[in-house]
Every structure is written in C-alpha cells, then in structure tokens.
Amino acid sequence: MFGTYERFNLVRASYARHGCNTYIAEDFHVRGQLRLGNNWTGESLNFSDFMFDIKLLMNGAPVKYSYFADPGALTMCADGGCVAIALTDRSHFRINGENAGLRLELRSASGNGAKACRGMYALPDGSGWEGDFGRFGKLFFKAITGNYNVTTVYAKGALVPDLVRIDFLPDASTGEFDAAVHDYRNTLIPFGEYEDFEELVEDNREDFDVFREIYNDAAPGYEEMAKYAQWMVWSCRTKAIGSFAQPHILFQNAWGCAAAPWQQSYNAMPMLSDPKEAWRQICVMFLYQDEATGRLPNMMTYSNPPMHGMQPAFQGFALDYLFRKVGDSFITGADAERMYPKFAAWAEYWVKYRNAGLGDDMIALLSPHESGWDDCSLFKDGFPTVDPCAVAFLILLMEAVARIAKKSYSFADMHDEWMVRANKLTQAMIDEYWDGERFVSKVNGKSVDSYSLANYQPIILGKRLPQHIIDKVAEKLTTEGLWLTDIGLASESMQSDLATFGISFVCGRVVGPMNMILTVGLQAAGKQAEADMIARRYCDHTNREGIILGYAPYNYYKYNGEKAAQQIPPHAADGWAWSSWSANSYLTMVTGVIGK
C-alpha cells in the first residue's frame, strides 16, 4: 500500500493500526527517514518532542533503506537484511529482524533533542528496560530473542539527556531478533503471551479485512482508492482507552490527533453494510453530553476529556442518509428508549441556547465552528448569524428525534410534535432566507453578501424543498466556473474575491466534506445525474492525488488572474495530510452516490 517505491509513501499518510497509539511517518525534510511517535497527547508530529528516528542497522551501523507497509506490518530492507514492525491493539508493537538490527533514537521535532525523556532504567526483575517520557507516557523495551543496548548520554549537570538510543541487534548465531515495545501511561498493561510474529502480521491483515466488511462495494473504478480510504479510517479507530469510553475515530494520527464530534457521524454514513455500528458511531458523543443543557461537547483526545464549544448537529443528516439507504430497523425499541431523551435534549439545546429571538425555533450561531465551516465567508459580517446550513442540520435532527420517538416504548406521542416543529422551521427558512438564487445568512436581519458553497447546503433537505429551489440549486452547482471546477465543487465561488487556496479550509479549496454533503443532498432531491457528475470529479481527483481534505482547483485566481497562494508543507491543514474525514467523505460518495 505505502512505500519507497509505491504510489503513495508515508510523508502525508502516517502508518498506524486500529486500537494502537503508535504511528510511523516519513520525515518530510529527510526523505527516507521513518519516524515513530504516539498520539497520547494529540500533539502534531511537526512539534512533538516524542519522536524517534527509525534506523536500520547493518553490522551495528545505520544504512539507507527502502520500506513497504501494508495492514500487516511495515518492513525495511537493505543489502539482504530486513526488519519488520507490526503494531497491535494491545498497547505494544513488535519488531522482528533478519540479518539486520534496528535503532530507535529520540529526536524532538521542535529542536529539543531528547528532552522528552525523564529517565531510562532497567527494571529490577530483569524483564527489560523502561523509559519515562512524561506527558507522552512510558515505553517498556524487551528482547524476546536477540540482544539490545540502551544508551543515554547526559551533559554535565543536565537533568535531561542529550541522547536516548535503543538498539535491537540480531543474535550472533542465527542473525535474527524479535523484540517488543510497550506503550502505556503509568503501569504496564497486561498483554498475555507474545504470539509468533508472522501470526501477528496475518492477524493484523485479517482485522483490517473484517473491518472492511462494514462498507458496501465501491463503484467501478474506485475500488483501489476505497481500500486506502478504508485503511485510513481503520488506522484512526481507537479502542476504549484513556478519555474514550468506546471506540472513536480520530481525524488523523500524526497531525490532528483528536476525535471531532461531528466527524463521528461522518464516519457512520458509509457503514451501510453494518448499520448497527453506524448507529453506535453516531451515538458515541452522547456519552459525554452535558446533562444540564443537552449540549454535545467539542473535540477530545486520548489524554484530554471533551472540550467546551461544539460542532453542528450533524447527527440528523447522517441518520437521514442511513434511513434512505437501509431503513431504520437497526434502531431497536430499547435503543430508541435510551437515546430519545438524549437526542431531544440536543435539539432543544440549539433552540434554547442559540435561539434567534424571532418567536420560533430559528437559531443564530455565535461562532463559525458551530456551522463546521471555520473560515467560511457566510460569517464575514459577524455574529449572531442566522445560517440556513446550520438550520437545515437542525431540521433533520428534529425529524430524527421524531423517528426515534416513534420507535421508542414511552415517547411515541412526541413524534407528531417534533415533525410539526421541523416542518414549520423548514417553511420559515424558505420564506425568510431563500432569495430566489440561493439561501442567505443574515446578521441583524440583513443578508450577508457571501458566495460560499454553504449557501446551497440546505439541499440536504431533499424533496422537502419546493421543486423550483431544487432546480435552481442544481443549476448553480453545475454551472462551470462558478462553484463547479474540474475536480469538484469549490467552497467559495471562483468569481469571489475572497476565494483563496492558501492556508484556508472552506474559503476556496475543493473540500471533501462539502462535496459529499452537496452530492448527498442533490441525490436526496432527485438530482442523481448532477450528484453523480460532481462526485465523480471529486473522487477521480482523489484517485490521482490521495486522501487529503482539500485541493486547490487552479494555480491562479479566476477573479483576477493572479497566481494563487500556496500552502507550504508540511502542516496539518487540509491541503497536506491524509485524514479519516476525507476518507469517509470519499467512501460515502463512491459507495452511496456514484452510480446509484
């Protein structure tokens, strides 16, 4: 899948495994140099002090190597010697070598050398060495076969080492070694017996193959990249550990190492072959719901609990998609009984704490993050902003609440009330925020002159909208040179002087989540041909470039002809690193929109 001579390497995508905190990435500045880190703290590999250079040793000296990685293991080879690293979901990874050794050398990404190390020491029972790395946790090093050396060098009077190096070396008689490195916070986690290394590699591959079964087949021509996308999601999937009460899916492993609340529902949408897992994925953030207000929290990491703030009420949109594709039998009566109060409280939070003061359920946002579109031109006139794209999410959430109520044992009588509220809010949005060409956001009753793609996001309401609005939205989205580019829909009109392809998210670049939302919406509205065409443009480009979040459609700005701003890598922004968010958006389009 990834490697020195493969189509994609590990410069933009990091190598990881479901349920493992360890990742491996190739150094952008020193090509061919692999680096090992963990995502306990959520710190980016660009800045983390906890990064180890991985060096292949021949006769005890580092040599240049090539590498290949698949879900089973990552293998490095040079001059007849090879070393493989296999990750596990049991808080350790294994290293196996033949005619070569392996060195892990601590080197901060911020120029702090080995500062992350608080001490390296042999354990009294003789089982191995332990390293204390402060907020990054601990590592336990054990030679199963072969040998290893631990080297720490301190400057005179220094409290932290200048050098931390662990060398795993082959047995002199066999030329082989087998080792384990455990990754944990405070105390070594029980792991059982070490299995045969090749058995572990096959188990990893099987785990990935089983995970892939939750997805429908990709449309013809998209199968190869769909496998990469599935691997991306699988490798970002946590186990229940640290702050995570259940498995979550991280945005990225090496860059943005956090679980975002609305992204959990994005990840659920393409899981059409296992809707019960999709339902669990949608419900997972309700584990941390504020019982007093009903608010769902913001992002969280392994070591940091959910943050304040919030993201959009995306759960209704995700459920609406699942209901259209597979029905609602995956929600049992017991599920509905348990989740109705939680979903209802989430909907009421928006109406109570973000009410626009217009005498109804209309809401006004206080932050762009509440729409999901962090730098969107919808919000250029300030706040509070009545934003139809967020209102559309709330409408679908209300309908989902109604449906869950109907399936419950005790709340079925609430179904009609929620549907009435959803319908009234839909009509109010159409009456007040459709200007004949687009939906508009408003600040203090005045329309915001924005050319954001988000103006058309209410198409997610599908056939709840009048046909003339559906037709107009489809027309606007399929007119070349406005939002439609050769590679999909740009997040800001190409005619807008606010469009930028530099360090931006949704102010010009062609972004996966927006393209997915709009194509799913067009499909729901009966515009399958238009949805198919846009999705193919986006996914065809992903096939060529890899699973990054946003692409620059051109190298110049159409509104003035000037050279476009550039993103300078490496960085965690949408134009560089691979992410599960781009992967799940791609998977939704190639399994549920294209050719359907």
Which residues does each predicted region cover?
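Short alpha-helical segments and helix-capping/turn motifs at coil-helix boundaries
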Residues: 162-164, 253, 265-266
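Alpha-helical support elements that line or immediately flank enzyme active sites
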Residues: 257-288, 454-466, 515-528, 538
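Short glycine/serine- and small hydrophobic-enriched flexible loop segments
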Residues: 269-273, 317-327, 396-407, 460-463, ...
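Extended, well-ordered alpha-helical scaffold segments
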Residues: 200, 204, 221-228, 274-287, ...
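Extended glycan-interaction surfaces of carbohydrate-active proteins
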Residues: 218-256, 281-302, 355-385, 424-510, ...
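Terminal accessory carbohydrate-recognition/targeting modules of carbohydrate-active enzymes
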Residues: 1-221, 273, 524-525, 576-582, ...
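The feature captures the catalytic groove of carbohydrate-active enzymes
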Residues: 166-194, 253, 297-314, 328-331, ...
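A structural signal for well-ordered alpha-helical segments within the folded catalytic domains
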Residues: 227, 265, 276-279, 283, ...
